[in-house]
Amino acid sequence: MRLKDKIKRPRRPVVAYEILPPREKDGTLNSYASNISSLLSQTHIDAINIPEVRDEVARGERPIKNQIRAEPREFGKLLQDIVGIEAIVNRVVVHQNIEQEMKWIEETNSKYEIENIITVGGESREIRYPGPTVNQALHAISQNDSLNLLCGGISIPSRDRESKRLIEKSENGSEFFTTQVLYDASNIIKMITHYQKRCDEKNTFPRRVLLSFAPVSSEKNIKFLKWLGVEIPKKTERLLIENSAIMSEKSMGITVSVLNEILSHLDKNKIKVPIGLNVEHIMSY
């Protein structure tokens, strides 16, 4: 079954594994992909989610130095060929005009055989970008009959009126969303509840939301997540740092606890928003 069909079947669980393209020092694409293949053979994964890494000036100094990496669509095609699992390629759409952006997307679909894309906006609303907004890009993709693409978007649960943004993106062609990394359940519970209410009012079906989790193993990982804008409660951060020797274990425990709290709320309140998991590999960032 194609990822597109899995995403659109509300009762079917969907799990994505998010990993960065390899750095130059990680060796060849083939050897890196083979390592990933060995890792993923031990579990069930529906898709490999590949982010696009860019320097983000507005966030301040990056706690972990950015390094030159392979192009996401090239890495995605190789993984599809070697691992046999569909790739989702993230694309920041704001940095070139709509014509150039659509050319890139068409090439990604036809030449690299990528059928799943997450459209990503700019890092700051205060910056004027030369390219389209996420909704403009989604609309252009949906109007292009030559494309065979499943489009998704990013969700930031702590952002004001985020449920309204999900509706707008859905109306422009987004069929699923991946959230920012979660270390607390309150904002995502609030967002999903509001999203369900808005969908009911509009008599439309909610799109799938992939809940993102990124277990950490060091204080450097925590600093990087916070630089990305991830909200980690102070109590949770203290618990992780004070138990640095078993941070990975503690982090996994927190992740499971947050997920169970979300699932319990959805079940108790009969919320029908289909969810899934997006597990991020933070160790090599």
Which residues make up each language-model segment?
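Catalytic-face loop-and-helix region of soluble metabolic enzyme cores
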Residues: 203-272
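Residue-level detection of beta-strand scaffold positions
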Residues: 47, 176-178
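Conserved anion-binding
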Residues: 116-154, 158-164, 172, 179-180, ...
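Active-site beta->alpha loop and helix N-cap motifs at the rims of alpha/beta catalytic domains
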Residues: 1-161, 244, 250-253, 260, ...
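Short, hinge-like loop/turn segments at secondary-structure boundaries
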Residues: 106-108, 195-197, 227-230
